[in-house]
Amino acid sequence: AGVVAKKVLADATIPDDASVNEINARIVEIGGVDFSTSLEMTEGALEMTKGALEMTGEPLEMTGEAQRVLEQAIKDGDSIGAVVECVVPDIDLGYGEPFWDSVESVISHAIFSIPGVRGIEFGDGFKAAAMRGSEHNDPIGPDGRPLKNGAGGVNGGITNGAPIVFRVAFKPTSSISRPQQTFNFQTGEMDTLAVKGRHDVCFALRTPVIVEAMTAIALADLIALK
């Protein structure tokens, strides 16, 4: 469905003769370690983690600290979460509605259908809570578009001509081999649970392409509604 939606977006010409034909999602944080400037995994890191991660598609580069966090989680029989950033650079202003079908709510509805999603933020996101209005406001330039993008490309639920920027938080994998205490309904007592088998230490490494697909579906809906 995401592929079909991307085709719809590529064919949907917007007023300035550009098309919404580019959606870019990437991992920017793993286990609390920010490596947003890295895009490809080193060969050594991929070789070290590929068995545990069962990675598919293009690999990611890890900084030394992110690689260490992954290694440590594997050794501990544990798992870690991650943050995926998605950018839609070429979308014109005027898509979305100010209430039920705001751009943020339509995209969020689609993104939260992905298993493991625990949060989403647009633009400055939760950092905006610590800002003053003078910091968070996006001045408008002579062409009618914002000069900065703290709003993440959306004002009042409607695209403002700037790139749509949002980040998605993924939880750690639930099934881990590290022993945990939980209630055993068969015995009626607390018991030790240790999940057997092979599991992803960070399943979020697989998700950027899924985030892109769901974003494409949401944007196709918004274009159809306009």
Name what the model sees in each region.
Residues 1-12, 105, 109, 162-164, ...:
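Alpha-helical support elements that line or immediately flank enzyme active sites
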Residues 6-7, 50, 75, 127, ...:
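Context-gated lysine
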Residues 32, 159-163, 195:
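Residue-level recognition of conserved structural "scaffold" positions that shape functional pockets
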Residues 60-64, 97, 101, 105, ...:
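Electropositive phosphate-/nucleotide-binding environments in soluble metabolic enzymes
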Residues 77-80, 84-190:
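Glycine-rich anion/phosphate-binding loop at the beta-strand->alpha-helix junction
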